Amino acid sequence: MYLTIWLVSILALGTWGQKFNRFCHYNSWALSRNPQHGLVPEDIDPFLCTHLILGFAEIDESGLRLKDPNHYQQEYLYQRIVRLRRINPRLNMILSVGGWDKSQEGYSKLVSSRENILFFTKWIITYLRRHDFDGLDLDWEYPTFKGSPMGDKKKFVDLVENLAYEFDIEEIPDIKWKLTLTWTADPLESVRTSAYDIKGIASKVHNVNLKMYDFHGHWDDPLQVNHHSPLTSPNSPRNVNELAKSWVKAGVRIEKLILGIPFFGRSFTLKTANMSVPGSPAVGPGSDFGDGIPIHNLCHIIRGGTKELYLPEKKVPYIVSGSEWIGYDNPRSVMEKAQLVFNNALAGVMIYSLDMDDHHGTCGRKWPMMMAVIHGLNAYMEYIDSKHKSLELTFNKKILRARVSLRNYRRRNQQEKVAEMEQRIRHLEQELQQSMGNMAYERQQAQAMLNRGVSLPPIEQQSWSW
């Protein structure tokens, strides 16, 4: 069922030709996960996302620059991430500054003076260009919170205005695109009214990324089990649908609005094991100790026999294992959230985070959550075509380089090299022809699947059994 926020049917009719942004977070600590679940940049499918957000860079003690990436051994990580553009030249690379534990002191220092803001604005452009990033994401969590002065709310707007202005007027002859500026924000009313001048910020950035998760957790008081990212809810405004509506009413244009989708669950330890319905009392976080449980872990729990339960009024699943209660998203629920974006012509989705999906396919097919999002956005054929065009372009580049080498060898009368290069060109042309045949078949199969229709699986069907 398609949900509509504003109930304007003519709007939904216009979305079929629209391409939706797919912002995907990739966290630097993804490399430190155990070998079974770690995700190195080279294993990322660069066509799954339109934008890859690398998190998180940290503002240094002076408030004027970012900390040296070597401080986090990230210099090489930057290079490895950006190298994905060799496979998909259209992939946008965004550097995110801040995050939950790296925001407050640095941002407050940065905006503490006009001089700091002006210096940082010039400096960050050079930094982004040097590391081959396409844009900057501001993830300050949050102005006026955790010791941040009340004046930081207005000063954050000043920072955004200066960045937007300098990004816009930047003129470099060999650069064919302008830098992108995005803002990642907490959608909850309690944060929104205190921390943000929504109109002031949203009018200057290209996209507003709403963190549509962590609405509930072990920090709640009183502490009760509740799903942290419900799509809808009849009894609380803390749900994706209502919060999206509230931000549009607050002044964010729908063509800028990006909805965050979590690829992790939040756990609680029940006070009484046999009292597990939502709203039951809890005594603290579960086995994740408050860090969140990635989908690539949850799928094994479910495949191991733990029964998946469903909250029809919230359109999200949860499980109970002993005294542990875990609310999470599965392929069905993220597809439905993506359909909300599609049906209302929003700008797209933000995935948090790509490295939490079952990217190795240990529970079935690879990237089950990401593929569900792509289907929900009706973007599967776009995904297939992008991969095919890139592969064809790669082969043609190899053939062109080989032919240039062949001409040089002939000019030098290096007959042995000529024979080797002629054989290489024949092999490349054969591989290209075979690949084109495979691509045509794959596209035909994809179109047939889409013609049959990709529907939501039955509620009673357990995830990762499809």
UniProtKB/Swiss-Prot annotation:
Coiled-coil residues: 408-442
Species name: Pinctada maxima (Silver-lipped pearl oyster)
Transmembrane residue ranges: none
Keywords recorded for this protein, A-Z: Coiled coil, Disulfide bond, Glycosidase, Hydrolase, Secreted, Signal
Compartment list: Secreted
Keyword Coiled coil: yes
Disulfide bridge positions per record: C24-C49
Occurrences of domain GH18 (ranges): 20-380
Residues annotated as signal peptide: 1-17
Listed EC numbers: 3.2.1.14
Top EC class for this record: hydrolase
UniProt-recorded name of the protein: Putative chitinase
Tissue: Prismatic layer of shell (at protein level). Expressed primarily in the mantle with highest level in the mantle edge and lower level in the mantle pallium.
Active-site annotation: E141 (proton donor)
